């Protein structure tokens, strides 16, 4: 497993990351209690300091005298951040993404560019899906009575795929409507093709519903307003998460404990320089040990694991010896 590999790397190169050689992996219960204890101390310290930003955060998310919701948010963000190669860089960047002033700054935000790429891709998939259905209506034994409606679908999907902004995608997806299919009474062609065309069309409709739920639950204008209002809370959540991370790391070091996320991050630090992103000598040495690297259940890999395995692959030499097998539909990281 990736964990056993990381453990092997650390056992043999612990001195490169200033780690005591007699470390041990904490059990789940022990680490859970330690997290709770450390987080309680972090929150107590912040209650005592009573900074306005912290008190506003508490007022916004705590329930009466119960701050369990706050603790849950901090721990959830902490765990999520550990799936990224450099959590202490990722967390502040995540908070900065809320620095939205208006709809224009929302459109130009870095995360929005990635989102637009996803929307463009799924829209092009809809074009391909609809095109396949329309093509079936053109077959000699195909359901030609559906051709007009399918041609309309195809035209609309192409218009959506040509959208250049989030606002355009929002308007085009939210306003999308479909013509009714003509009656198939008296059809004497291929029944399988008729059913397939209807199935493909429904698949497209279902995909559009999912896209609207996932991306267009509110207008870009309201989204920008909400992000602007949420920015101070996001910044405070990130600050508390980083403070917890530092305290928890220090306590684990004091007890000479590591968890499974630590194994991955320690191995990553042995292989890759955080500041430059360049592969270290140790990783280059490991490259010569593997003719091929094969990853099964790739959909369950996180970015830390992928960075580790790419570091010991020979891609930089132009030798592509890294192979993955997986099913994205089963991914446990489909957040």
Listing of model-derived features with the role each one plays in the protein:
Residues 2-56, 107-114:
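Conserved P-loop NTPase-based nucleic-acid remodeling module centered on helicase motor cores
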Residues 3, 12, 16-18, 174, ...:
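Preference for short coil/turn "hinge" residues that link or interrupt alpha-helices
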Residues 7, 23-36, 69, 204, ...:
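Conserved helicase NTPase motor core
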Residues 9-13, 38, 164, 173, ...:
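Alpha-helix boundary/capping residues
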Residues 13-17, 39-50, 65, 78-85, ...:
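Conserved NTP-handling cores and scaffolds of large molecular machines
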Residues 37, 68-258:
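Conserved ATP-driven helicase/translocase motor core recognized via long
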Residues 51, 56-67:
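Alpha-helical transmembrane helix bundles of large polytopic membrane transport and channel proteins
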């Amino acid at each position: 497993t990736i964990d056993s590999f990381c453990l092997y790397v650390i056992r043999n190169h612990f001195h490169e990351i200033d780690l005591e050689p007699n470390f041990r992996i904490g059990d789940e219960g022990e680490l859970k209690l330690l997290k709770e204890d450390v987080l309680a101390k972090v929150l107590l310290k912040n209650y005592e300091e009573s900074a306005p930003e912290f008190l506003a955060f508490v007022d916004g998310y705590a329930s009466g005298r119960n701050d369990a919701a706050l603790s849950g948010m901090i721990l959830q963000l902490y765990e999520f951040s550990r799936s990224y190669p450099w959590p202490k860089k990722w967390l502040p960047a995540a908070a900065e993404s809320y620095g939205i002033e208006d709809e224009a700054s929302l459109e130009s935000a870095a995360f929005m560019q990635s989102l637009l790429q996803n929307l463009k891709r799924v829209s092009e998939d809809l074009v391909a899906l609809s095109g396949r259905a329309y093509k079936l209506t053109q077959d000699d034994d195909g359901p030609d009575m559906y051709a007009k409606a399918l041609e309309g679908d195809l035209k609309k999907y192409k218009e959506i795929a040509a959208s250049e902004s989030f606002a355009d995608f929002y308007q085009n997806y939210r306003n999308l409507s479909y013509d009714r299919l003509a009656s198939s009474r008296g059809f004497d062609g291929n029944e399988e093709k008729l059913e397939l065309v209807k199935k493909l069309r429904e698949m497209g409709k279902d995909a559009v519903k999912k896209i609207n739920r996932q991306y267009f639950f509110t207008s870009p204008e309201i989204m920008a307003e909400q992000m602007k209002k949420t920015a101070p809370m996001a910044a405070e959540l990130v600050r508390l998460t980083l403070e917890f991370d530092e305290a928890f790391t220090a306590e684990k070091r004091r007890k000479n404990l590591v968890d499974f996320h630590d194994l991955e991050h320690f191995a990553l630090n042995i292989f890759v320089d955080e500041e430059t992103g360049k592969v270290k000598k140790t990783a280059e040495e490991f490259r010569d040990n593997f003719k091929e690297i094969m990853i099964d259940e790739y959909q369950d890999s996180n970015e830390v694991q992928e960075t580790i395995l790419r570091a010991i692959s020979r891609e930089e030499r132009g030798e592509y010896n890294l192979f993955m097998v997986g099913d994205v539909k089963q991914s446990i990281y489909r957040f």
